[in-house]
Amino acid sequence: LHDALPISAKICNILLPLSIYYAVMAWSRNCGRTFWLLFPFIFFGAFQLVLLYLFGQSIIAVDMFLNLVTTNSSEALELLDNLIPAIVIVVVLYIPALILATISIVHKRRLSEAFIRQARRRTLYVLSAGILSLGTAYLTDNRYEPKSELYPANVCYNIALAFQRTAQTRNYHKTSKDFTFHARSTHQADEREVYVMVVGETSRACNWALYGYERETNPGLSGIGGLTAFSHVLTESNTTHKSVPMLLSPVSASSFDSIYYQKGIITAFKEAGYQTAFFSNQRYNHSFIDFFGKEADTYDFIKEDVGDSNYNPSDNELLKLVAKELGKGVSRQFIVLHTYGSHFNYKERYPAEQAFFLPDMPVDAEVKYKDNLINAYDNSIRYTDNFLVRLIDMLQEQHVNSALIYTSDHGEDIFDDNRHLFLHASPVPSYYQIHVPFFIWMSDNYRQRYPSLLEAAQANRQKNVSSSASFFQTMLEIGGVETPYRNDSLSVTSALFIERPRVYLNDHNEARTLDDVGMLKEDFKMLEEKGIR
């Protein structure tokens, strides 16, 4: 039950479903058959227990169902290894009950007619109490919605939404085929330009030395010139399949459903005359990340290059593709990289010989291994730091107008407080899942050619920024791409940048304020400590 619900709603959420289950069970003398007819709800209950084990709260969200489709097998196996306790609980609770129900059906066991008649008479009173509790919930909380708050009605509603979104996604190529940015370049054609957009994975700002973390997780970036780091940046989603498309397109939490009719930033740069490339260290997710990536002149999802689900290349493999692309010497180049960053299992994100913080094992998903998990996580950020420094060096060696922009799709919970939250993508986000790193690097040539953008970036670095709304817009301005979809009031390299109220994309694709998505006092305390409004 959600902590934000009034007591009347909590009572309703218990009483009404129980009354309906009671009525259904009283319908037949063969309880085993009825129990099996309720199997979909039993399955939801098992799924819910696993979710509670992972996140400690919240019902099965639309995004959870979509993750079943978009999460690849290697990611799933990494997580399943750490869900054994939850799976054991599910097996112990449900398998014996299903076996007993099967025995009841096979042996045609029946409850007595007298017992059933008495149970059916009670049904009227039980259902009346449930309906009365529903009315009370409506009267005492004007925001109460069964489709959002009442289990299992909310789960059924979310399933319907998941099917709807899956159908819309499959139809994307038809609904977006006529879209155009009407983009053009405002930069001089006789100057070579190279711009790189890096989308990180599961990296939270509070573990970056660039933002005051006490550990040396950014030994390379801390000494890089021309780098502007933005401190107060929040993502508008804690799920990869939503956050990354917002980074790569004009949509944000306030306009997310328009994504089915638009294309990504690669198309905008192509229209403006750039040679484009997209390189990813993640597998296909059969959704917008794939769609936007495949808009490029050259694209490669390197994990798909080998027919082995256990293939685990490091992010540094992407640098080989970047070097090859830069070697083409094209006058205008735009490269997008999607890394694997700090995705769990953290220890597998960097070579063992580069482990700096020890011990970094075992790293099972248990509170008692928190220190080991943090060590492994911080090692993965150091590896990201090295990756980004090498990438910047490659651009600097070109001696052209070049720039790099980086952020992460979302952060991560690592048993940080007494809630013992772990991982990300929970239906209710936490501070640790939404505060992300965001920085811009500009080459010497670029800073000399466009000094006003550097000045604006420096002026905006302590302002409140949404990565979901500003990443795309900032890249357009840096690359000199003019389009009706460009909005400089969202670009952190613009003097026109305007701070906006924080919003978050909830499970129903609605933009909600942070205090309306279920975040708790621990999260707001952390935001306040970081000076984030």
Where are these regions (language model features)?
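Active-site rim elements
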Residues: 146, 253-256, 308-309, 370-385, ...
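Metal-dependent active-site segment of extracytoplasmic phospho-/sulfohydrolases and closely related
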Residues: 196, 380-423, 472-476
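Histidine-centered active-site microenvironments of extracellular/periplasmic hydrolases
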Residues: 212-216, 400-401, 407-451
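Short beta-strand segments
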Residues: 278-280, 334-341, 378-381, 403-408, ...
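A long, amphipathic alpha-helix that forms part
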Residues: 320-324, 361-404, 440, 462
